[in-house]
Amino acid sequence: MPHPVDMVVDTGDKGDLWMDAIEAEKRGDREDSLRICRELVIGEPDNSDAWMMIARMELPAPTKGKQEMPSLVQTAKSVTALKKVVQLDPENRRAWDLGGTLLVDHLGMMEDALTWWEERREHAPAEVTPLIEQVSILVRMGYYEECADLIEEMFSPEMETVDGGLRMRMGRVSQTVSKASK
């Protein structure tokens, strides 16, 4: 068993690694930040923040405010890290949103994306976003009839209150399904 002093130093080293990763990101050195976070999760596999940084650093850096399209390899690596993030921190909405976007828009994995959002619903049953995403995916797949139950649930009183923008999106999704199913 390690000496208690060694354990304290160990914790400090991990904290130092995390600070180094943040500093590398601030400097714009994504590769160094990625390398440090990979090293960090080897010793601290339950560090959801480090996994989230890995997921972000695997993707191309935005240039002039626009996100460059990631390669399949970059996307797959990012999704793998995001799966770890949501496993460790199921309340990390940013990870859920990014993972859903990557699965649908960059990998075209519609079935996996449906499962992804269903898992989110298990953790946040009153959240509307997973339902909207599932309906949108089903519409893209042409499964309009399957959308009806989800839309009904989306507008049920048990669901969280949403802001105007999300309410408009819910209405658009509902209208799209209604028109397409006729």
Task: For every predicted segment, state its role.
Residues 2-16:
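TPR-adjacent "capping" and linker segments in tetratricopeptide-repeat scaffold/adaptor proteins
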Residues 27-35, 62-84, 106-119, 142-149:
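Structural signature of tandem alpha-helical TPR/SEL1-like repeats
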Residues 50, 95, 130, 163-164:
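TPR alpha-solenoid repeat register
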Residues 11, 45, 90, 125, ...:
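Short coil turns that delineate tetratricopeptide repeat
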Residues 22, 56, 63, 101-102, ...:
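Residue-level recognition of tetratricopeptide repeat
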Residues 13-43, 59, 63-68:
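Alpha-helical segment of the N-proximal tetratricopeptide repeat
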Residues 39-40, 84-85, 119-120, 154:
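Canonical positions in the second alpha-helix
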